[in-house]
Structures are given as C-alpha cells and as structure tokens.
Amino acid sequence: MAKKVENIVKLQIPAGKATPAPPVGPALGQAGINIMGFTKEFNARTADQAGMIIPVVISVYEDKSFDFITKTPPAAVLLKKAAGVEKGSGTPNSVKVASVTRAQVREIAETKMPDLNAANIESAMRMIEGTARSMGFTVTD
C-alpha cells in the first residue's frame, strides 16, 4: 500500500546552500522532517546549479519519511541573470532597467517549459515576456 501524505512543504532555497538555520529549519521542523537528512540530500542534488534559487516541494508522509521534487528556477531569477542586473525596476511602467533579446527569452522558456502551464514554446515565451515587462525589462528582437 502507498504511504499516506501528511503534509506538503514548499520552499525556495539557494542551490547547494540549504542549512538547518531559518527559514529552512523551522519549516521542516514543524513538519517533523529530519532536517539534516533533507539538507544533505538537497545540497547534493542541487550542487551543479550553484547561485540559483531552486523551488522545492517536499512531501511528508505519516511515518515522517519524506521525498522532494526540485523545480526549475523562477523566471524572474533567470531573467535577472540573463540581463545581468541585481533587481528589477521599482516602477516598471516608467523606468526600464535592462533589456533581454527574444533569443534569451526563448532559452529561458525552454528551461522553464516543464514547470509552465503552456502548450507550446510560443505561449511559454509570451509568459516569460510578461514577467520581463513586469520587472521593467524591454524585450528586443
């Protein structure tokens, strides 16, 4: 018989840098997860993606065992990396802080495709372009 899921915990953690300190420790402690076991396994799985923020969905079972799924980094993080900026615009409608090319948007959309609710790459690109515009980026050809 399959294990019964007791709790689901969603976190965004820097790749390879999960520690028992807040915010990871308290979130996992409340769910009753072995914190050191999770941090070691997460850091081992994400060591090759250093510098990225990785969303993770942790399923906690009744016997306090767990497993987790790592997702692709958020579109905003990938866009900031592609544009080479620290943060987006505080007023995106009036102040543009950077620009990204359609080729960069396509590359990000292809990376994000497994996690996006998009039927094809063009609709995924439109989602990424919308995120870019809301961050104060211009999309150029």
UniProtKB/Swiss-Prot annotation:
Q: Which Pfam families match?
A: Ribosomal_L11 (PF00298), Ribosomal_L11_N (PF03946)
After translation, the protein is modified as follows: One or more lysine residues are methylated.
**GO CC aspect terms:** cytosolic large ribosomal subunit
Q: Which domain of life is it from?
A: Bacteria
The record ties this protein, via Gene3D superfamilies, to:
Ribosomal protein L11, C-terminal domain, Ribosomal protein L11/L12, N-terminal domain
Keywords tagged on the record: Methylation, Ribonucleoprotein, Ribosomal protein, RNA-binding, rRNA-binding
Query: What GO molecular function annotations does the UniProt record carry, in alphabetical order?
Result: large ribosomal subunit rRNA binding; structural constituent of ribosome
Q: Which GO terms describe its biological process?
A: translation
Q: Which InterPro entries match?
A: Ribosomal_uL11 (IPR000911), Ribosomal_uL11_bac-typ (IPR006519), Ribosomal_uL11_C (IPR020783), Ribosomal_uL11_C_sf (IPR036769), Ribosomal_uL11_CS (IPR020785), Ribosomal_uL11_N (IPR020784), Ribosomal_uL11_N_sf (IPR036796)
**Classification via SUPFAM superfamilies:** Ribosomal L11/L12e N-terminal domain (SSF54747), Ribosomal protein L11, C-terminal domain (SSF46906)
In its keyword annotation, does this UniProt entry include Ribonucleoprotein?
Answer: yes
Family as reported in the entry's similarity comment: Belongs to the universal ribosomal protein uL11 family.
NCBIfam families linked to this entry: L11_bact (TIGR01632)
Give the quaternary structure. Part of the ribosomal stalk of the 50S ribosomal subunit. Interacts with L10 and the large rRNA to form the base of the stalk. L10 forms an elongated spine to which L12 dimers bind in a sequential fashion forming a multimeric L10(L12)X complex.
According to its UniProt entry, the function of this protein is described as: Forms part of the ribosomal stalk which helps the ribosome interact with GTP-bound translation factors.
HAMAP family linked to this entry = Ribosomal_uL11
Q: Which protein is depicted?
A: Large ribosomal subunit protein uL11
In which organism is this protein found? Streptococcus thermophilus (strain ATCC BAA-250 / LMG 18311)
Gene name, Swiss-Prot/TrEMBL = rplK
